[in-house]
Amino acid sequence: MAEQPALQADRVPPEVRARVEELRRLIQRYNYEYYVLNAPTVSDAEYDALMLELRRWEEQYPELVTPDSPTQRVGAPPAEGFATVQHEIPMLSLGNVFSDGEIRAWAERVYRLSGRQDVEFVTEPKVDGLAVSLLYRDGVLVRGATRGDGYTGEDVTNNVRTIRMIPLRLYPPEGVIVPPVLEVRGEVYMNVRDFERLNRERGEQGLPLFANPRNAAAGSLRQLDPSVTASRPLRFAAWDIGLWEGTEPPATHLATLEFLRQLQIPVVPDYRLCRSVDEVIAECHRWQERRDALEFEADGVVIKVNDRALYQALGVVGREPRGATAYKFPAHEKTTIVRDVIWSVGRTGKLTPVAVLEPVEIGGVIVERATLHNEEEIRRLGLLIGDAVVVQRRGDVIPKVVATIPQRRDGDERPVDIPRQCPVCGAHTIRLEGEVDRYCPNPNCPARLKASVRHFASRNAMDIEGLGEKISDLFVDLGIIRSLPDLYEIDWARVLQLEGFGPKKVENLRKAIEASKNRPFARFLFALGIRHVGERNAQLLADHFRSIDRLMEATIDELLQIPGFGPAVAQSVFEFFREPKNREMIERFRRLGVRMAEEEAAAVATVQGPLAGKTVVLTGRLETLTRSQAEELLRRAGAHVTDSVSRKTDYVFAGADPGSKYVRAQQLGVPILGEEDLLRMLRESGIEVEAAARS
């Protein structure tokens, strides 16, 4: 029995084995010519004949079938979900620059940190798609993974195998050595023309349309059924390498891209070597001018240090490499007409004017509404309903009215009505002294409640998975939730009667809400939605008072003792906890078992180490930790982290490019320490810095 595989393999004639290998090599080459170079050298009939011959040989000799055969691109059954993949080398995100001056400033930092003025750069288009990692072992594609959060992604191997631009096996030309382990990183995307055709076909079939090529590419790659992915016109462009084991990697980024091209791996188009920052800027301008004529969506230009050793030596800040950045194109702008102005109501009661627009496509997205911020902005713009306006998708995400075009008025325009009553509940609106915003003062306003519930359940607050905007708004509309504490007294029997709420979905939501009772005290304070209390101020309140009882009895003077708290913040917190309805709400939360104290208070008080009880400030960029990681570790070491430097500050920890806090510390004579001091003191306090940095 043990010899059977050998006997089976022996039955394949050597000439057949050689022909099959030749067919696979030819088909891979013709795929590259057709899909990547757009310059086929054989007809479709000739290509089909080769594929048919290969299939027949594999049918006759099944033992010849391997996962990297071109016949096996589609064949995996639908999956129930995606497994997770840990990236051994993190897939870092890039920082952004938005102007010539910022490009020069970034390059100057590179010059200064490297001690060199002869640094070369490579520019390439920032293809707008989904970042993926392709892992080859001994030249065979063994894994495809999405970028995810940069550290953990999803295994989409069966799906990337369906993309014909991606070689399943590498056939290096003579003299080129493929390392035993090679990770290729790049972008899965969709050409604009292919995207438009796909949407046209979906429209004819009555299916929902994709918003833009990036969404189409991401949605197509993350299909559980690989055959669906195979039916979509996905493309791939490599922009770097990750893992490289067994041989010496190329010395430059330019050589890396050329190496990938030799392996018939498609790379980002039209990359250029630049020997000065002036050349870099010229290339960015060139790409910006031809942006709208590109076959693919690009939202900027990637600029990388060419020397790979220097790139590595420059290191990382947070999740961004110092040796690369992205020049982002200016946001798309279009002209359209304002048909109306409506007012939305937020959780604090703030009324925000929103322009209702004649629909206009900006950057592949149909924009129908745009923010106007407040009534002062309406006055500044001189906006009238019916005006022609310039709308910008700021950062290619948030639409905003940036200008009016008065010369296009025809006399039918009318002024914008400033609401004296809340558009939702009818309460008389108010303006607080010194503020430009108008507020609905009614705490029971349905719009305020909806916004409050969404905020309370959000990821950075109580993090209630599954309680999104649609469900939370529905629960408010149906009266299932009439106040925030009602979240913990939901009538689940009633919810089960609602359409779309099966037992499993309801049970998962119930468990998520129950689990949120044990969130840290600071998160609970942030979730309450107190004016002027964001995540940082919520943490400061939790650190200072340690429990809701002490906080509720705090005076304004006590609140002002918190570093960074000014009169407006102190007054807002004081008034919130003096309001009888809010105190009643807190007591309901207490009865329902919500955590409202720092349970670690005793442990923190007994922390031994150089940071225990110290007031510290962070400034500049850290290489080892993100700012939030550093703050969390300092708190665990017993330190109080504040935003501003005062005579009460014990230490200022300064990273790269420190700001005004550094100068203030010098003026006050506050000890200034570096990142190495920070890491050493954390370790002396018993903190595992390396484990935290990897998390």
Curated annotation (Swiss-Prot):
User: Which Pfam family name is an example for this entry?
Assistant: DNA_ligase_aden
Which keywords, in A-to-Z order, does the entry hold?
Answer: DNA damage, DNA repair, DNA replication, Ligase, Magnesium, Manganese, Metal-binding, NAD, Zinc
What residues does NAD(+) bind to? Answer: D44, A45, E46, Y47, D48, S93, L94, E124, R147, E187, K304, K328
Q: What is its EC number?
A: 6.5.1.2
**The protein's role, per its UniProt record:** DNA ligase that catalyzes the formation of phosphodiester linkages between 5'-phosphoryl and 3'-hydroxyl groups in double-stranded DNA using NAD as a coenzyme and as the energy source for the reaction. It is essential for DNA replication and repair of damaged DNA.
> Which family does the record claim for this protein?
Belongs to the NAD-dependent DNA ligase family. LigA subfamily.
Q: Name it.
A: DNA ligase
Please report the organism this UniProt entry assigns to the protein: Thermomicrobium roseum (strain ATCC 27502 / DSM 5159 / P-2)
Question: Lineage of the native species?
Answer: Bacteria, Pseudomonadati, Thermomicrobiota, Thermomicrobia, Thermomicrobiales
Q: Which gene encodes it?
A: ligA
